């Protein structure tokens, strides 16, 4: 009788230890709709070149590791929307998200012209506003039921280089929770690592929640490219097959727009659309992602002119 009771107690303790650090139950989070993978009919399907600046962490928890996790997760999920090409060299123009926030966003407006020349359409940057893990446990017993709560808030902003203005700003949370059974006085290091894992998952959930918004945004904004070189009758464009340019596409050639300021406050309102100089017809591709075009209609085209799908 005593032996049977001892065996039952031993089995109970082993089962409790096995449940010491179970994997967190993944909460359901919204994923972008399948319709976002291809732009709706009526919008051009040319991919926009994006400069994704590394996010930074303002909270006292998670440090740089959490910021890297948020940046990588957002990039991975947004790449599935198929509306964007990530331009790492272009991102170097602006630095990191921390630099943009430190300057109040003025750095974006200052470098917009340089970004246009490099072919960037959008700049995406962000920060972790808050991140923490809290726990609630039973007061009594050797094996205690513990519920862990991970809370995070991520802010992401999108800057339209062509319009020279911010076109999206939002904050989303990634709150998750998990229940587990833990032995009283369990190893502290294991508990801390468990909390870190839950916090990483929380910020991933927050990053994923931005994908539907940003995917829709990319489908609605105009793509803008640039005349990179002119050799004889051939005009070379800084976007091609990878970006979604097709042979036979007609591109309109535009002059650079003018900055528009509020006469009362002096604040910049945006950039006007440039004047149409003519149209080009795409006849071939070159390099990794470039297109060759010829003059279709209109007057003189010069290197540095901007182009849009007609």
Where are these regions (language model features)?
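Positively charged n-region of N-terminal signal peptides that target proteins for export
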Residues: 1-4
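Bacterial N-terminal signal peptides
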Residues: 6-15
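C-terminal/domain-edge helix-coil "capping" segments
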Residues: 18-46, 160-232, 247, 252, ...
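N-terminal segment of the mature soluble domain
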Residues: 47-54, 58-129, 165-169, 246, ...
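Soluble non-cytosolic domains of exported or imported proteins
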Residues: 61-72, 105, 109, 146-149, ...
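Short coil-to-beta-strand transition motifs
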Residues: 122, 219-222, 271-278
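Amphipathic beta-strand/beta-sheet edge segments enriched in Tyr/Trp
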Residues: 125-182
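C-terminal soluble interaction/assembly domains
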Residues: 250-287, 296
């Amino acid at each position: 009788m005593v032996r049977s009771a001892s065996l039952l107690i031993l089995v109970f303790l082993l089962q409790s230890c096995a449940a010491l650090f179970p994997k967190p139950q993944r909460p359901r989070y919204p994923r972008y709709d399948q319709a976002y993978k291809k732009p709706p009919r009526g919008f051009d399907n040319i991919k926009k070149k994006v400069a994704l600046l590394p996010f930074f962490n303002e909270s006292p928890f998670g440090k740089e590791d959490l910021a890297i996790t948020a940046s990588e997760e957002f990039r991975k999920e947004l790449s599935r929307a198929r509306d964007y090409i990530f331009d790492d060299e272009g991102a170097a123009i602006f630095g990191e998200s921390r630099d943009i926030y430190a300057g109040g966003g003025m750095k974006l407006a200052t470098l917009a012209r340089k970004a246009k020349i490099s072919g960037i359409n959008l700049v995406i940057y962000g920060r972790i506003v808050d991140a923490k893990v809290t726990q609630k446990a039973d007061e009594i017993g050797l094996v205690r039921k513990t519920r862990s709560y991970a809370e995070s808030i991520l802010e992401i902003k999108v800057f339209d280089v062509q319009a020279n203005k911010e076109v999206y700003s939002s904050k989303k949370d990634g709150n998750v929770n998990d229940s587990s059974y833990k032995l009283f006085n369990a190893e502290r290091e294991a508990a801390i690592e468990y909390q870190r894992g839950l916090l990483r998952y929380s910020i991933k959930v927050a990053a994923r929640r931005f994908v539907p918004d940003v995917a829709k945004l990319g489908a609605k904004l105009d793509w803008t490219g640039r005349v990179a070189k002119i050799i004889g009758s051939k005009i070379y464009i800084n976007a091609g097959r990878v970006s979604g340019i097709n042979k036979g596409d007609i591109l309109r050639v535009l002059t650079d727009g003018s900055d528009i300021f509020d006469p009362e406050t002096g604040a910049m309102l945006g950039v006007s659309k440039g004047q149409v100089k003519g149209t080009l017809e795409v006849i071939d591709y070159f390099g990794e992602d470039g297109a060759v075009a010829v003059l279709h209609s209109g007057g003189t085209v010069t290197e540095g002119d901007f182009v849009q799908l007609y």
